[in-house]
Amino acid sequence: MEATADLLKEGEKAKIAGLTEGQFSLKLAEMGCVPGTEIIRLYESSGGSTIAYRIDTYLLGLRKEEARLIQVEPIETVIP
């Protein structure tokens, strides 16, 4: 099974490995989600529909289905 950003646990750090082909993939790339960039899952909204990530040096909120388009390679766990 391929690791994707929606499967990262809170505080888990990874490198973006690629993007799944799709209409939203170009938008993700424009927002800085490019291979080699560091991504950390920060927290989930109270309703569970949105996940906050730190991508390089900024915060980005994504729906779970959007985060599923980001392929990742986990590198370490960060204790919040």
Please give the residue ranges for each predicted region.
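Conserved hydrophobic positions within beta-strands
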Residues: 16, 39-41
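A structural micro-motif recognizing beta-strand termini
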Residues: 18-22
